[in-house]
């Protein structure tokens, strides 16, 4: 696998109960390929396969590793060396928490600690694991103490910290819906925008049969001074607003854009908005619900 062709690779590891599963879920929602508990010795084979067959489907690969894997400590260093020879330099995220917090989490979930049993009680198992993983902690690019984090806190921190490591996580998906007010407002919209103030090509006999997908309609609606001013301010508003929703942990937002019939003004505006948001690295879907009715 050539270095230029490799997917970004992260290894999420650390103390049991510190939040590894939560972090893996966060990355999965962000369109990373995630896998937990994979034997260390087969990681290189997995990455070769993904680089060959899944380059366009995922933003990267996130591997969850911990002491439950029988070969973890013995093969961890060797696996890193093999990856580096392949041109892959994995980033390591190490999760930890104070012992009281970990003990409380295990007591709450009533799940046994992986090292608990025999002469080791829960508190001793937590400390023993901390000592065993000290060399792994030393290799980490990012150490997160999750003692005071809620699940939502952890999600926000993961996004922020990963960006500081050189990654880019534009997590919010924007769903655009166009509609005609005379057919009803979409019930699944988070926000509704009424564009009936814009010039209406419906009353131009040469334009009436066209739709907002046609250049003539787009020029009529957004090419005039009123349309240009509106669209610039509308886009600026959304580019300010959407990151605020991202910061609150939202995964998606649905914007409904309406005009009288849902064929001209709303469609042309939504088409332009989709293109503009994609240039800002948002994942955008677009549905014209009433374009054939208006």
UniProtKB/Swiss-Prot annotation:
What GO molecular functions are on record for this protein? ATP binding; GTP binding
Annotated binding of GTP, by residue: 66-69
Q: What start-end ranges are recorded for coiled-coil regions in this protein?
A: none
The superkingdom of the source organism is: Bacteria
Instruction: Give the UniProt keywords, A-Z.
Output: ATP-binding, GTP-binding, Nucleotide-binding
Spell out the family assignment given in the record's similarity comment: Belongs to the RapZ-like family.
Q: Name one Pfam family in it.
A: RapZ-like_N
Q: Does the keyword ATP-binding apply?
A: yes
The organism named in the record is Oleidesulfovibrio alaskensis (strain ATCC BAA-1058 / DSM 17464 / G20)
Name used for this protein in its record: Nucleotide-binding protein Dde_1774
- Function summary: Displays ATPase and GTPase activities.
Binding positions (ATP): 14-21
Q: Which cysteine-cysteine pairs are annotated as disulfide bonds in the entry?
A: none
Q: What is the lineage of its organism?
A: Bacteria, Pseudomonadati, Thermodesulfobacteriota, Desulfovibrionia, Desulfovibrionales
């Amino acid at each position: 696998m050539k270095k230029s062709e490799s997917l970004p690779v992260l290894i999420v590891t650390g103390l049991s109960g510190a939040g590894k599963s939560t972090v893996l879920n966060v990355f999965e929602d962000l369109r990373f390929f995630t896998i937990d508990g994979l034997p260390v010795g087969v990681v290189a084979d997995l990455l070769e396969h993904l680089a060959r067959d899944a380059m366009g489907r995922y933003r990267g690969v996130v591997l969850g590793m911990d002491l439950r894997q029988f070969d973890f400590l013995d093969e961890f260093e060797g696996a890193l060396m093999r990856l580096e020879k392949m041109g892959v330099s994995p980033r390591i995220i190490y999760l930890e928490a104070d012992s009281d917090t970990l003990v409380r989490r295990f007591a709450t979930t009533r799940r046994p600690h992986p090292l608990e049993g025999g002469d080791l009680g829960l508190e001793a198992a937590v400390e023993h694991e901390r000592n065993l993983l000290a060399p792994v902690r030393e290799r980490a690019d990012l150490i997160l103490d999750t003692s005071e984090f809620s699940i939502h806190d952890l999600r926000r921190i993961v996004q922020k910290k990963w960006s500081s490591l050189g990654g880019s996580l534009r997590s919010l998906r924007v769903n655009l819906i166009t509609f005609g007010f005379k057919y009803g407002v979409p019930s699944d919209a988070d926000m509704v925008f009424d564009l009936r103030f814009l010039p209406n090509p419906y009353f131009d006999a040469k334009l009436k049969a066209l739709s907002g997908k046609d250049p003539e309609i787009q020029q009529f609606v957004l090419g005039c001074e009123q349309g240009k001013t509106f669209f610039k301010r509308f886009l600026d508003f959304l580019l300010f607003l959407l990151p605020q929703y991202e910061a609150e942990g939202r995964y998606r937002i649905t914007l409904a854009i309406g005009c009288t019939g849902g064929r001209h003004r709303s469609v042309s505006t939504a088409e332009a908005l989709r293109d503009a948001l994609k240039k800002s690295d948002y994942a955008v879907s677009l549905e014209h619900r009433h374009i054939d009715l208006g």
